[in-house]
Amino acid sequence: TRFDVGIAVYSHNQLYGKWYFRKAGNYPKTGRSLRMELRGEKRSALLYSASEIEILRPEEEPDHPYLGKLGPDAVDPDVTRAEVLAQLEDPRFRGRNLGALLLDQSFVSGLGNYLRSEILWWAGLHPSWRPKELDDEDREDLARWILDVTRQSYETGGITDCLERVEDAKGRGVPF
């Protein structure tokens, strides 16, 4: 997370780190360990149970052992389909099966298991297939789905289905 004051906070939350956003001074009742608090006049961001936290200056990020290896961030609006397509065609990645590749944060960062499954479903691709086995159209479609599914999920709090279908289902009383 980058801040306007010229620093970034790197935290590795594993599966158990958790952020809470609350009124300043209002701490949740939890058995977790408070690892970091960012406190303003009215609100606080509290990070519990993270395994690693570092404060970095922007010039330190490229040399960080984890951050320096990350691929393009799928949520970043400045990342283009062409960049993702270039990753799919890169010799480091084109021979790897899609199931493993989509979890490799050096390929494209920000994807996890459920996004991998959704991306492959929407693209109509099998997880054992490799980018070099796909035709140009399938690779271009995959690059599009990587960005579209990830960004929609981020913007909607996790919805990866067709938004029109979701709205129709909600209108019929289907719980979401």
Q: Where in the sequence are the language-model features?
A:
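Glycine-rich loop at the start of a catalytic domain that most often binds anionic cofactors/ligands
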Residues: 2-7
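Phosphate/anion-contacting hairpin/loop surfaces
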Residues: 9-110, 115-122, 130
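Basic, nucleic-acid-binding surfaces and adjacent catalytic neighborhoods in DNA/RNA-processing proteins
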Residues: 87-176
